Each structure stands twice: as structure tokens, then as C-alpha cells.
């Protein structure tokens, strides 16, 4: 064994062993319990960042722990390789997106290998490879045949100068990122998948996921947004036309004072034909893209159409307004406005002087002031004809019944969830496998024509997609007839919605999945990724699994049993202000700090002498230049040290503050472990400790070892509190470094302890533990060594500490044999000098004994 811990040499050797022996290759074995652990795969942006390292380290700890517990572990890796950043990088670097992507994959793959993750590299996937997206294209055509795919017009960002569609990220303050032309909203035909057909399943399925974070489930419930209400039909005055609205508050129906419709609603467009001012307002609304999240805070604007609807029950006219807060693609594109009982309606009515009629009163009879705000709570009805006095539920049902009997309303369950628009007018994505025939018919591409391959050797001009710019690419045939390929590509969430399933049979060429493999490995046992994916990826991922199930490809209802959402990685951010008043952000690696005795920053300067402002701990980002390069850290400290710090510095779900002093501490800890094994190995023993021959000090140390094993096993396996597991190992290590190695039983206890520590740390710091396991004389390889088990007998305390109180105050502590009787414990306590002092001259009137913990004397 080498005397010095040299991670730079050791880690390369261990990684070479793993690679040469395919140690982590996963093979289906029905005789073994499987465990599928998966991290959300990375976008190949060029370099790993610390957020990646944290995510993948957590997954690797879980994988290695489960492997030591005898499970057949699958931990695959791949690349979410399509996406807009590749197009921008290709234009900037005068290269093709494919070339940029594949170079990044090669680079990042080496970075992952440096960190020692136990991946089955034979299952590696890159979603931009035709052999992957072929099956995605095929599945889309199958969904089309089942009626789950359709095409309709939808709004996009349109640059009229470049005549191209822009992604949201390419719109800067309402203008095109390239030419600064004001962006318009344009309707174009796009493909959709009917996720709404699965809304109820997606909602109810959340109740079958007890090991998902409650926050993620709540976010999905809110996103799906199930509501029970009534769809009501209003007639238009002096017309045969009608307009439908949906409301969850039919109890407020008598308080409707106006109707608001979206700019794209047929009523609005009809009214605009003879009203130039209204036409201009409608165009302004259409050119302002509004995210649903902004509706609550944006300025409410509207204009009267001059059209009235007729209230179905009262027969009174209801003026129709065009309003910028009503979206055409949500609900019916029209809402009934009850300003007395909806705050948004109230603000609009107040602004434009529209009537505010109270129809709900508080149940307790209190007066409300409708000049200040709407009363939005449930209550009892007033000013509502025969429904006066009813509470919410009775009024809901009473008014719904009346509307249904009149033939102008129907009870309805609605969802906030909208169908998934999967068309993207970008180049770097999987081509959508639909063909347009000369007669205008649209048909799915047949399997024998798949994959429709995206050309990779292209020149990007930053304006048009190469497959849209090249008319020859789209030309094809269908049953001998000329046809045109679709030039839109799939939303990249398509690829990430089923990759986890393809990992079970990545080289399978006969179909999308080998169902035998898929049904052995699925569902995923542990999935790990950021909570920012809660309502997009994690919802599409669940939806796709149900589609795969209904196609007979998988047999389970949900894709993963357990979900862990790791916290962000933060780092100090520093800047100085340039002569032009611009903030120049400086990398923390170039900052010199002066701190006070409590570690607080007093002064920060960079290597050019600028005095810096400390902007605090913020998420690592390019914009603040505070990212820490994992590769630099691995080269400086070793992969095990980086992994140990990542797992120790914070609970997995919480934010982690990057502190290089903490990384240095992790390196010192591993050095101490190495030194301890080195010292022990000068005179090791082969025999296990003999419990009957141990001194009380040796028993106490052994008891600490086995209590630590029990705690660490629970912390890693059940609680997933990896930081507390490491803290317990560090506490044990402090005791081991102080323990003597004088006689054989000392060394036997130490040998058992070191064997346990090395196995407990192995999932976290596998390289050093791989070597130390061999150095401790083990002939097997630690990768498949069994997880260390706690010895129940060793954990039993021979002695117990009893706190002694007199009149409620602690006056002594006594250590007594664990089996000592209560009367004997009293006798020992009363012999204590300090206890005698506080009982002197008093009579004991009561004795309270809590077995093994507390003896309390009440004296007068």
C-alpha cells in the first residue's frame, strides 16, 4: 500500500479497471431483484456544470448502494441532443449543429468518466441519432391512426423581415433577436397530441405515487387544473348567433354585468369589420404575446364591441367587450364577468365604468364594500330571484338545474391542461413523419420509409431552417404519387418523454421497445432531476408512459416509483462597475478575499486589482460568471473529494452553497482515512473481534461502529439524507483516529471498523474505497461486496447513563450497568456527594424513575 493518498493516479487506475471489466454492464436476470436508477439526461451544451455533477452523484450513490444490497442495477446515460442552442452555436461558430453536438458529447462523456459514475455505457443514447428518433416517428404515426394526433392553427412568434418563426427565447423586448424587427403573432397549422384525453388519468395517477415530492404532485394537479362548472350559452341580440362561456361559479350568475371575449374570438372579429379603432385594438392584442402567468399582473385593457349578449335567465342585455386578459386558446375564448365577485372583473369594470351588482353576501351577515374590492368568497345568494338565501352548493346545483332545463347550460368537468403542441419550426429536431399529397390530403409516413432522416451536413444562416430553405429535401413519394414531407420538427420534449424506456433495449431494431426487457426493468425505481421540470417534462413523461402502456409496449401505469428533486448549486458572485456603468462579473476563481474571524467577506479584489462588490450566493450561471468548472476541481482535488463535498454540504433537496474551503476539508478527511488504513496495515489481524474478550472501551468503540452502520444504512437506503450519513461516518472516524492499536482485540475492532467505513463510503467515494478494500486484504472486488450489516448484539449498551434530579433540577449523572435494578440505582444515586448536598435536611416524599434515563427525587 502506498503511504500517500494520490487521487490523480488512483482514480485513473480504478476507472480503467471498471472500463476493461465492464463492471457496471446491466443484464436482465429474472432470478435477481432489479433496480433501475436514472438521472435526467443532459443536454450536450459543451461542458458539465456543478448542477449536473450533483444530480449524477446522487444517482450514483443510490445505484452503488443498491448494487451492494444484491440488486441487479441498471444506471444508463445518454444525451438529450436536439434543441435550439445548437442552432445558435452553429451560426456563431460557422459549423453544423450535428458536428457541434457530437463534439460536445465526446467532451462531456470524458468528463462523466472522470467523475467515476457507474454507468452501463453500452446503453448510451443520443436522441439526435436516426436509430433513436425512427421509433418516435413510428409511434407518432400510430397515435395519428388512433385519433390521438391532429393538426390545427396555433399562434407563433413571427418575424416579418426574416419571414421566420421565432422561439420565445429569440424574442427580446418584443423584437427579433437578429434584426430588431417588431415581432408579430401569426397563426400557422401545427401538430398536437391529445394529452387532454388522459387528463383524468394523469390526475388520479398522482395518488399512486407516494414517493414523489408533494410539491411536484401539487404543481401537476394545478397544471392539469380540474374544475367542475357549467357551460352556458348566451344568445346574441338581434342575431341567430350564440356564444358559450364556462364558469365554476354559477351561483354568481345573476351578477353578470358584461362579457369579455378574446381578440381572436369570432364576435370580436365580426365587430371589428365596421370599427377601425376596434380592429386596431384587436391587432395590438394579437401582437402582444401573453403568458398565462402574466395575466394577473398585466394592465387590463378592453374595448366595447357594440354587441350585446342576452342573459339567459333575466333576458337583460349583457355588453360584449374585447379584453386583453382573455385568451382564445383557453376555454371558449369568452368569459362572463361578475365584477362584484371576481377581482379581475372588478378592476376592469372599475376602469371602464361598468355596473357592479352584488349577488353574494357573507354568511355571517357582515356588510361588504364593493367600491374597494370584489367579495370573492363563497356566501349566501342575494338579488338572485328564487335562489336568494341559498349557500354555494345549493345555489350551484339550483342554477345549474335551471339552465339545463332551459336547454342553455350543461354541467361540465373542465381542465386547464391544453393539448400538447409538438410542432417546432426549427431545424435541429426530429422531422415530423407526415406527408402531404398533391390533392392536399395528409397521411402518416409508412414504417418502411422511416426514419425520415434530418440532414446533418448543413449550413446555418441563422434565419431559415435548412430543410425549409431546400425545396428538394421535402420532395418524396407515397404509393408512387408525389408527396411533400413535413418541414416542422418535433418539440424536444418528445425525445425526453420516452428515453427512459428505450434504455431498456437501446440496440433493439425490431421495434420501439423489446417488451420483455422493458417489463423487466420498468418502472424506474429512482428518478432524479430538478423541480423546474415538474409541469413539463415530468408530465409528458407520465403521459407518454400511458401511451406506451395503451400500445401494449409496457405493462405499468407510471414510469417511475420514486422521484428526488435535487436543489440548485449556488456560488459567490462578484462584480465591478466599468467606466461605462456596466457590471463586469468576475469568476470566483480569480477573486482574492479578506475575511473577518467569523468568515464574513470584508474585501474582495480580482487579479487585475479591481475592488469587487460581493453580490451574495446565487445560482451558478454564465450571466454572473460564477460557475465552477467540475473538471478543474477534479484535477485539483480528485473526483472522490468533489463527490464527497457534493453529498455532504447540504441535504439533497436543498440548495448547495459551493465553498472551496469545504472541498479542501473533504480532501483532508479522505487523507485521514487513507492514513488510518496505512497505520492499521502495519500490523493487521485476520480475526474478527471476540465479544467476550473485549474491554469496556473496545466494546464501546465497537458499539459506535455498529450504531453508525445502522444509521448510515437507514440514512442512505430509506431516508436519503446522505449528508447526515456522511456526518455519522465522520464522527465515527474521529473516534477511530483516537483509538489505540496496542493489543490484538484493539486491532480486531479497528479492522472491523475500517472494513465497515470503507463499505459505507464506497457509494459516495468509490475510487479510494475500491483501493482501500483491497489494501484491507479482501480478495473480492468492493463493487459487488455485500453492504455492511449492523450487529444487533454489538449495539446493546452494557451501561446506561441516568440523570439524577432533586426537585426538578439536575444534580448528578451516574453510569450504571444496563441490567441494574431500580432500588440499586437509587442507592448509587443517593451516595453521590452533590445529590446528598441538595437533599441535606429534607425528606424525600416521592421518587420518579424513568427506566434507564432519569431518577427524580421530590423532597421537602
Swiss-Prot record:
Keywords: Aminoacyl-tRNA synthetase, ATP-binding, Cytoplasm, Ligase, Nucleotide-binding, Protein biosynthesis. GO terms for molecular function: aminoacyl-tRNA deacylase activity; ATP binding; leucine-tRNA ligase activity. It comes from the Bacteria. Its EC number is 6.1.1.4. It catalyses: tRNA(Leu) + L-leucine + ATP = L-leucyl-tRNA(Leu) + AMP + diphosphate. GO terms for cellular component: cytosol. One of its GO terms (biological process) is leucyl-tRNA aminoacylation. A motif ('HIGH' region) lies at residues 42-52. Pfam families: Anticodon_1, tRNA-synt_1, tRNA-synt_1_2, tRNA-synt_1g. A motif ('KMSKS' region) lies at residues 619-623. It is found in: Cytoplasm. Transmembrane segments: none annotated. ATP binds at residue 622. Belongs to the class-I aminoacyl-tRNA synthetase family. This is Leucine--tRNA ligase. It comes from Mannheimia succiniciproducens (strain KCTC 0769BP / MBEL55E).
Amino acid at each position: 500500500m502506498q503511504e500517500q493518498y494520490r487521487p490523480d493516479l488512483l482514480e485513473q487506475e480504478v476507472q480503467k479497471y471498471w472500463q476493461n471489466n465492464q463492471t457496471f454492464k446491466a443484464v436482465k436476470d429474472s432470478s435477481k431483484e432489479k433496480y433501475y436508477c436514472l438521472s435526467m439526461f443532459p443536454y450536450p451544451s459543451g461542458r458539465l456544470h456543478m448542477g449536473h455533477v450533483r444530480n449524477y452523484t446522487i444517482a450514483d450513490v443510490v445505484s452503488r448502494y443498491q448494487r451492494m444490497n444484491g440488486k441487479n442495477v441498471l444506471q444508463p446515460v445518454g444525451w438529450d441532443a436536439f434543441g435550439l442552442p445548437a442552432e445558435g452555436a452553429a451560426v456563431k461558430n460557422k459549423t453544423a449543429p450535428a458536428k457541434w453536438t457530437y463534439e460536445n458529447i465526446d467532451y462531456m462523456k470524458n468528463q462523466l468518466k472522470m467523475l467515476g459514475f457507474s454507468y452501463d455505457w453500452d446503453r448510451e443514447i443520443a436522441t439526435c441519432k436516426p436509430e433513436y428518433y425512427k421509433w418516435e416517428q413510428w409511434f407518432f404515426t400510430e397515435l395519428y391512426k388512433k385519433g390521438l394526433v391532429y393538426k390545427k392553427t396555433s399562434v407563433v412568434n413571427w418575424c416579418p423581415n426574416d419571414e421566420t418563426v421565432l422561439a420565445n427565447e429569440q424574442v427580446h423586448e418584443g423584437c427579433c433577436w437578429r434584426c430588431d424587427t417588431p415581432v408579430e403573432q401569426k397563426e400557422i397549422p401545427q401538430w398536437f397530441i391529445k394529452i387532454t384525453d388522459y387528463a383524468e388519468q394523469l390526475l388520479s395517477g398522482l395518488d399512486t405515487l407516494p414517493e414523489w415530492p408533494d410539491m411536484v404532485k401539487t404543481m401537476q394537479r394545478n397544471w392539469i387544473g380540474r374544475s367542475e362548472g357549467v357551460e352556458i350559452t348566451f344568445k346574441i341580440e338581434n342575431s341567430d348567433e350564440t356564444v358559450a362561456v364556462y364558469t365554476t361559479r354559477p351561483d354568481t350568475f345573476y351578477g353578470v354585468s358584461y362579457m369579455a371575449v378574446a381578440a381572436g374570438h369570432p364576435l370580436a372579429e365580426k365587430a371589428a369589420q365596421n370599427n377601425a379603432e376596434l380592429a386596431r385594438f384587436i391587432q395590438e392584442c394579437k401582437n402582444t404575446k401573453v403568458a398565462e402567468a402574466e395575466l394577473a399582473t398585466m394592465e387590463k385593457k378592453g374595448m366595447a364591441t357594440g354587441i350585446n349578449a342576452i342573459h339567459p335567465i333575466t333576458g337583460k342585455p349583457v355588453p360584449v367587450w374585447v379584453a386583453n386578459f382573455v385568451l382564445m386558446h383557453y376555454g371558449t375564448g369568452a368569459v362572463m364577468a361578475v365584477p362584484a365577485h371576481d377581482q379581475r372583473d372588478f378592476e376592469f369594470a372599475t376602469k371602464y365604468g361598468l355596473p357592479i351588482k352584488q349577488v353574494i353576501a357573507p354568511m355571517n351577515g357582515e356588510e361588504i364594500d364593493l367600491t374597494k374590492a370584489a367579495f370573492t368568497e363563497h356566501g349566501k345568494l342575494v338579488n338572485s330571484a328564487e335562489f336568494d338565501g341559498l349557500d354555494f352548493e345549493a345555489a350551484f346545483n339550483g342554477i345549474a338545474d335551471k339552465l339545463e332545463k332551459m336547454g342553455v347550460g350543461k354541467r361540465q368537468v373542465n381542465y386547464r391542461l391544453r393539448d400538447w403542441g409538438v410542432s417546432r419550426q426549427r431545424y435541429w429536431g426530429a422531422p415530423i413523419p407526415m406527408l402531404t399529397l398533391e390533392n392536399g390530403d395528409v397521411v402518416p409516413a409508412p414504417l418502411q420509409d422511416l426514419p425520415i432522416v434530418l440532414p446533418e451536413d448543413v449550413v446555418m444562416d441563422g434565419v431559415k431552417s435548412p430543410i425549409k430553405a431546400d425545396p428538394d429535401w421535402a420532395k418524396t413519394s407515397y404509393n408512387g404519387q408525389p408527396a411533400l414531407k413535413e418541414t416542422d420538427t418535433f418539440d424536444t420534449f418528445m425525445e425526453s418523454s420516452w428515453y427512459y424506456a428505450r434504455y431498456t433495449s437501446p440496440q433493439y431494431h425490431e421495434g420501439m421497445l423489446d417488451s420483455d426487457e422493458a417489463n423487466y426493468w420498468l418502472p424506474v425505481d429512482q428518478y432524479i432531476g430538478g423541480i423546474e421540470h415538474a409541469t413539463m417534462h415530468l408530465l409528458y413523461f407520465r403521459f407518454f408512459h400511458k401511451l406506451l402502456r395503451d400500445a401494449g409496449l409496457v405493462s405499468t401505469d407510471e414510469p417511475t416509483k420514486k422521484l428526488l428533486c435535487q436543489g440548485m448549486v449556488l456560488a459567490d458572485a462578484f462584480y465591478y462597475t466599468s467606466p461605462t456603468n456596466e457590471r463586469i462579473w468576475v469568476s470566483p476563481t480569480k477573486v482574492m478575499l479578506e475575511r473577518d474571524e467569523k468568515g464574513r467577506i470584508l474585501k474582495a479584489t480580482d487579479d487585475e486589482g479591481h475592488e469587487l462588490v460581493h453580490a451574495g450566493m446565487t445560482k451558478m450561471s454564465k450571466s454572473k460568471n460564477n460557475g465552477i468548472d467540475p473538471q478543474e476541481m477534479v484535477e485539483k482535488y480528485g473526483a472522490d473529494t468533489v463527490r464527497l463535498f457534493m453529498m455532504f454540504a447540504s441535504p439533497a433537496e436543498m440548495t448547495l452553497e459551493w465553498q472551496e474551503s469545504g472541498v479542501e476539508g473533504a480532501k483532508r478527511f479522505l487523507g485521514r482515512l487513507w492514513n488510518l488504513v496505512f497505520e492499521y496495515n502495519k500490523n493487521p489481524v485476520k480475526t474478527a473481534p471476540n465479544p467476550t474478550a473485549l474491554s469496556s472501551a473496545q466494546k464501546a468503540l465497537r458499539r459506535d461502529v455498529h450504531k453508525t452502520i445502522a444509521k448510515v444504512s437507514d440514512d442512505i437506503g430509506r431516508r436519503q439524507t446522505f449528508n447526515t450519513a456522511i456526518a455519522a461516518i465522520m464522527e465515527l472516524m474521529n473516534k477511530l483516529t483516537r483509538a489505540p492499536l496496542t493489543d490484538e482485540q484493539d486491532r480486531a475492532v479497528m479492522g472491523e471498523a475500517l472494513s465497515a467505513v470503507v463499505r459505507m463510503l464506497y457509494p459516495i467515494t468509490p475510487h479510494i474505497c475500491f483501493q482501500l478494500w483491497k489494501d484491507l486484504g479482501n480478495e473480492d472486488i468492493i463493487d459487488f461486496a455485500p453492504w455492511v450489516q449492523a450487529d444487533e448484539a454489538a449495539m446493546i449498551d452494557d451501561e446506561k447513563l441516568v440523570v439524577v434530579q432533586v426537585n426538578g433540577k439536575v444534580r448528578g449523572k451516574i453510569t450504571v450497568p444496563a441490567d441494574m435494578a431500580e432500588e440499586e440505582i437509587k442507592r448509587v444515586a443517593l451516595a453521590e456527594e452533590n445529590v446528598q448536598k441538595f437533599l441535606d435536611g429534607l425528606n424525600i416524599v416521592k421518587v420518579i424513575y424513568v427506566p434507564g434515563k432519569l431518577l427524580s427525587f421530590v423532597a421537602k
